[in-house]
Amino acid sequence: AVAASELPDTINADYQLGGAYVPPAGVTIVVRDSTAKPAPGLFNICYINGFQTQPGSDWPKALLLLDTKGNPIADPNWPDEYFLDVSTDANRKAILAKLVPVIKGCAAKGFKAAEFDNLDSYTRTDGRLSAAHAVAFAKMLAAATNAAGLAAGQKNAPDLARRVKAEIGFSFVVSEECHRWDECRAYTDVYGKQVINIEYSDDLRGTFEKVCADPQPPKSTILRDRLLVPKGKAGY
Protein backbone atom coordinates (compact mmCIF):
# COMPACT_ATOMS: atom_id res chain seq x y z
CA ALA A 1 0.00 0.00 0.00
CA VAL A 2 1.15 3.53 -0.72
CA ALA A 3 1.23 5.69 2.40
CA ALA A 4 -0.93 8.80 2.50
CA SER A 5 1.47 11.71 2.11
CA GLU A 6 -0.44 14.21 4.22
CA LEU A 7 -3.62 15.01 6.11
CA PRO A 8 -6.84 15.88 4.26
CA ASP A 9 -7.23 19.48 3.03
CA THR A 10 -9.93 20.17 5.61
CA ILE A 11 -8.46 19.52 9.05
CA ASN A 12 -11.24 19.33 11.63
CA ALA A 13 -9.82 16.91 14.15
CA ASP A 14 -11.11 15.12 17.22
CA TYR A 15 -8.73 13.66 19.78
CA GLN A 16 -10.24 10.50 21.27
CA LEU A 17 -7.47 8.78 23.21
CA GLY A 18 -9.54 8.32 26.37
CA GLY A 19 -12.16 6.25 24.56
CA ALA A 20 -13.90 6.16 21.19
CA TYR A 21 -17.24 7.90 20.52
CA VAL A 22 -19.15 9.07 17.46
CA PRO A 23 -17.28 12.17 16.21
CA PRO A 24 -19.21 15.47 16.10
CA ALA A 25 -20.59 16.57 12.72
CA GLY A 26 -17.96 18.22 10.53
CA VAL A 27 -15.03 16.27 11.92
CA THR A 28 -12.71 14.99 9.17
CA ILE A 29 -9.86 13.49 11.22
CA VAL A 30 -10.00 11.33 14.33
CA VAL A 31 -7.06 10.33 16.54
CA ARG A 32 -7.67 7.08 18.41
CA ASP A 33 -5.56 4.64 20.39
CA SER A 34 -4.03 1.69 18.55
CA THR A 35 -6.35 -0.63 20.51
CA ALA A 36 -9.47 1.11 19.13
CA LYS A 37 -11.20 0.79 15.78
CA PRO A 38 -11.10 3.72 13.33
CA ALA A 39 -14.16 5.93 12.85
CA PRO A 40 -15.94 4.91 9.62
CA GLY A 41 -15.52 7.19 6.62
CA LEU A 42 -12.97 9.56 8.20
CA PHE A 43 -9.18 9.98 8.13
CA ASN A 44 -8.04 8.11 11.24
CA ILE A 45 -4.70 8.55 12.98
CA CYS A 46 -3.48 5.72 15.20
CA TYR A 47 -1.86 6.70 18.52
CA ILE A 48 1.20 4.63 19.43
CA ASN A 49 3.44 5.21 22.44
CA GLY A 50 6.73 5.05 20.59
CA PHE A 51 9.25 5.93 23.26
CA GLN A 52 7.66 4.80 26.54
CA THR A 53 5.68 1.79 27.74
CA GLN A 54 1.91 1.88 27.82
CA PRO A 55 0.50 1.34 31.33
CA GLY A 56 0.12 -2.38 31.98
CA SER A 57 2.13 -3.47 28.94
CA ASP A 58 4.81 -6.14 29.24
CA TRP A 59 8.33 -5.21 28.12
CA PRO A 60 11.63 -7.05 28.72
CA LYS A 61 13.72 -5.24 31.31
CA ALA A 62 16.65 -5.23 28.87
CA LEU A 63 14.74 -2.75 26.67
CA LEU A 64 13.86 -0.35 29.49
CA LEU A 65 16.00 2.57 30.65
CA LEU A 66 17.46 1.63 34.04
CA ASP A 67 18.84 3.66 36.94
CA THR A 68 22.14 2.90 38.68
CA LYS A 69 20.39 0.31 40.85
CA GLY A 70 19.02 -1.52 37.82
CA ASN A 71 15.43 -0.34 38.25
CA PRO A 72 13.33 0.88 35.30
CA ILE A 73 12.94 4.66 35.21
CA ALA A 74 9.40 6.01 35.08
CA ASP A 75 8.36 9.24 33.39
CA PRO A 76 7.99 11.78 36.23
CA ASN A 77 4.84 13.12 34.53
CA TRP A 78 3.31 9.66 33.97
CA PRO A 79 4.61 7.34 36.71
CA ASP A 80 2.96 4.25 35.18
CA GLU A 81 4.95 4.68 31.95
CA TYR A 82 8.61 3.67 31.70
CA PHE A 83 11.22 4.99 29.29
CA LEU A 84 12.27 2.67 26.48
CA ASP A 85 16.06 2.53 26.16
CA VAL A 86 16.64 3.64 22.57
CA SER A 87 20.32 4.44 23.18
CA THR A 88 21.75 1.56 21.12
CA ASP A 89 21.06 0.29 17.63
CA ALA A 90 20.45 -3.23 18.97
CA ASN A 91 17.85 -1.94 21.41
CA ARG A 92 16.19 0.21 18.77
CA LYS A 93 15.83 -2.82 16.49
CA ALA A 94 14.42 -4.95 19.32
CA ILE A 95 11.94 -2.25 20.39
CA LEU A 96 10.88 -1.71 16.77
CA ALA A 97 10.24 -5.45 16.43
CA LYS A 98 7.71 -5.19 19.27
CA LEU A 99 6.02 -2.12 17.79
CA VAL A 100 5.82 -3.24 14.14
CA PRO A 101 2.85 -5.57 14.88
CA VAL A 102 1.06 -2.59 16.46
CA ILE A 103 1.75 -0.47 13.37
CA LYS A 104 0.61 -3.24 11.03
CA GLY A 105 -2.46 -3.76 13.21
CA CYS A 106 -3.42 -0.11 12.78
CA ALA A 107 -3.07 -0.45 9.01
CA ALA A 108 -5.14 -3.64 8.94
CA LYS A 109 -7.96 -1.94 10.86
CA GLY A 110 -8.10 0.91 8.36
CA PHE A 111 -6.15 3.72 10.01
CA LYS A 112 -4.46 6.04 7.50
CA ALA A 113 -1.65 7.38 9.69
CA ALA A 114 0.17 6.91 12.99
CA GLU A 115 1.53 9.37 15.54
CA PHE A 116 4.24 8.30 17.96
CA ASP A 117 4.04 9.77 21.43
CA ASN A 118 6.94 10.83 23.65
CA LEU A 119 9.54 11.72 21.03
CA ASP A 120 10.56 14.31 23.65
CA SER A 121 10.99 11.76 26.46
CA TYR A 122 14.79 12.04 26.24
CA THR A 123 14.44 15.51 27.82
CA ARG A 124 13.13 13.85 31.00
CA THR A 125 15.89 11.23 31.41
CA ASP A 126 18.59 13.37 33.07
CA GLY A 127 20.87 12.97 30.06
CA ARG A 128 20.65 9.18 29.83
CA LEU A 129 19.02 9.55 26.40
CA SER A 130 19.78 12.19 23.78
CA ALA A 131 18.02 13.87 20.88
CA ALA A 132 20.23 11.82 18.55
CA HIS A 133 18.92 8.59 20.11
CA ALA A 134 15.32 9.79 19.75
CA VAL A 135 15.76 10.88 16.13
CA ALA A 136 17.49 7.62 15.20
CA PHE A 137 14.55 5.62 16.54
CA ALA A 138 11.96 7.99 15.07
CA LYS A 139 13.53 7.39 11.66
CA MET A 140 13.04 3.64 12.08
CA LEU A 141 9.44 4.09 13.26
CA ALA A 142 8.59 6.31 10.29
CA ALA A 143 10.11 3.87 7.80
CA ALA A 144 8.15 0.96 9.28
CA THR A 145 4.97 3.05 9.28
CA ASN A 146 5.34 4.06 5.63
CA ALA A 147 6.14 0.45 4.73
CA ALA A 148 2.80 -0.53 6.29
CA GLY A 149 1.02 2.01 4.07
CA LEU A 150 0.48 4.67 6.74
CA ALA A 151 1.57 8.29 6.96
CA ALA A 152 3.88 8.92 9.92
CA GLY A 153 3.48 11.92 12.20
CA GLN A 154 5.64 13.74 14.72
CA LYS A 155 4.25 14.21 18.25
CA ASN A 156 5.32 17.26 20.26
CA ALA A 157 9.08 18.06 20.58
CA PRO A 158 9.01 21.51 18.89
CA ASP A 159 12.80 21.80 19.21
CA LEU A 160 13.16 18.82 16.87
CA ALA A 161 10.53 19.80 14.30
CA ARG A 162 12.82 21.18 11.62
CA ARG A 163 15.35 18.39 12.08
CA VAL A 164 12.94 15.46 11.97
CA LYS A 165 10.92 16.90 9.09
CA ALA A 166 14.12 17.17 7.05
CA GLU A 167 15.80 13.93 8.16
CA ILE A 168 12.77 11.68 8.52
CA GLY A 169 10.09 13.22 6.36
CA PHE A 170 7.24 13.11 8.85
CA SER A 171 4.05 14.07 7.00
CA PHE A 172 2.34 15.97 9.81
CA VAL A 173 2.61 16.82 13.50
CA VAL A 174 0.30 16.44 16.48
CA SER A 175 1.14 19.01 19.15
CA GLU A 176 -0.18 19.49 22.65
CA GLU A 177 -0.56 22.97 24.14
CA CYS A 178 1.55 24.80 21.57
CA HIS A 179 -0.43 27.98 22.32
CA ARG A 180 -0.08 27.60 26.08
CA TRP A 181 3.71 27.34 25.76
CA ASP A 182 4.09 29.65 22.74
CA GLU A 183 5.47 26.89 20.50
CA CYS A 184 3.04 26.87 17.57
CA ARG A 185 5.33 28.65 15.11
CA ALA A 186 7.96 25.95 15.65
CA TYR A 187 5.49 23.53 14.06
CA THR A 188 3.64 25.68 11.51
CA ASP A 189 6.87 27.16 10.11
CA VAL A 190 7.96 23.61 9.27
CA TYR A 191 4.72 21.72 8.57
CA GLY A 192 2.50 24.52 7.28
CA LYS A 193 -1.15 23.47 7.63
CA GLN A 194 -0.24 19.86 8.44
CA VAL A 195 -0.57 20.50 12.18
CA ILE A 196 -3.15 19.26 14.68
CA ASN A 197 -2.96 21.02 18.04
CA ILE A 198 -4.72 20.18 21.29
CA GLU A 199 -5.17 22.69 24.10
CA TYR A 200 -6.41 21.53 27.51
CA SER A 201 -9.24 23.24 29.36
CA ASP A 202 -7.46 23.23 32.73
CA ASP A 203 -4.48 25.28 31.54
CA LEU A 204 -5.39 27.74 28.80
CA ARG A 205 -3.65 31.03 28.12
CA GLY A 206 -6.86 33.09 28.27
CA THR A 207 -10.25 31.85 27.09
CA PHE A 208 -10.58 29.39 24.21
CA GLU A 209 -12.14 32.23 22.19
CA LYS A 210 -8.91 34.21 22.70
CA VAL A 211 -6.86 31.18 21.70
CA CYS A 212 -8.85 30.89 18.47
CA ALA A 213 -8.56 34.63 17.78
CA ASP A 214 -4.76 34.46 18.10
CA PRO A 215 -3.15 34.00 14.65
CA GLN A 216 -0.34 31.81 16.06
CA PRO A 217 -2.09 28.49 16.77
CA PRO A 218 -3.11 26.41 13.75
CA LYS A 219 -6.74 26.53 12.62
CA SER A 220 -6.97 22.86 13.55
CA THR A 221 -6.61 23.60 17.28
CA ILE A 222 -9.09 21.69 19.43
CA LEU A 223 -10.05 21.99 23.09
CA ARG A 224 -10.11 18.88 25.26
CA ASP A 225 -10.34 17.94 28.91
CA ARG A 226 -7.00 16.79 30.31
CA LEU A 227 -8.13 13.17 30.84
CA LEU A 228 -9.66 12.94 27.33
CA VAL A 229 -12.94 11.61 28.71
CA PRO A 230 -15.24 10.14 26.02
CA LYS A 231 -18.21 12.27 24.96
CA GLY A 232 -21.24 11.55 27.12
CA LYS A 233 -19.17 10.93 30.26
CA ALA A 234 -18.72 13.45 33.08
CA GLY A 235 -15.79 15.77 32.46
CA TYR A 236 -15.89 15.75 28.63
Language model: regions and residue ranges:
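Glycan-processing catalytic domains of CAZymes
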Residues: 1-236
